[in-house]
């Protein structure tokens, strides 16, 4: 099992959903950065379960930084975060141990770990571990923000309902990002918020679940981040986004829409306006895998939560018998509104790692004449 990622900055994720605690270690952070614990708490609150549209498993999610920080500043050594699991109900899972939940990692975990995996609450595969990602991602976002780089996401669509997309106008986009970052249910159009909540509540009442698409925007990035081919900006960010449970699709800019465009429509013409920029942004601020200074726009597809309360056909892995399965326990009818801060967090980590690569090279290069 590979639980770590990163080049200049690495993070290692550990723990299980129903274990005593979950945690994450960030290694390679610069020394001397003042960490805003209140901002970490605010970001954690965006991920918390709320009302009828989320799981009834409510955790305190108190973030304990046990190394790598002293007197509120990063020390430059490995920073480890621990979050205790205080509200587990493992008996909800013992009743159907071995019965494979459709859409979950139960079968694949059995095949990979030969039954030694902690299956309770999904174990290490659980979305519970994203709490650690949000805590660590908050620190990464704070460092990026100190450099003028800001990230924000909103629910672009949920089931058949759609929000207003992020604006192509930079000033309005900046305003939209700051506004959605203050919201628990992140939509630009507050009117559609209530319609979306009603759809989630309806699906929950039917014992079903919903998915949708998140739109993420990053502004303030300098040109020149990323590497050709294997460490392109798209490669790094999509790798990290796909590590978020329930993500099934990632696209940048026009994405699959390019298939219906001509080159004359898809190309972003350059012009000079105090700096070189593009007149349009179909390519989402990335050319050749490297940032061009325009906003990065990402679309992430989140599948409907696989834990539904309808009876489903399955197999008992232990007895090798066909069975009917009805899942018990506490589950989300939709995770879009909670996943948005998780996507922001993994994107922040990837960008900070790329940013540190650029800083390592830039001072060694003279100006081209």
PLM regions and their residue ranges:
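Generic N-terminal targeting/processing segments that precede catalytic cores or assembly contacts
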Residues: 1-369
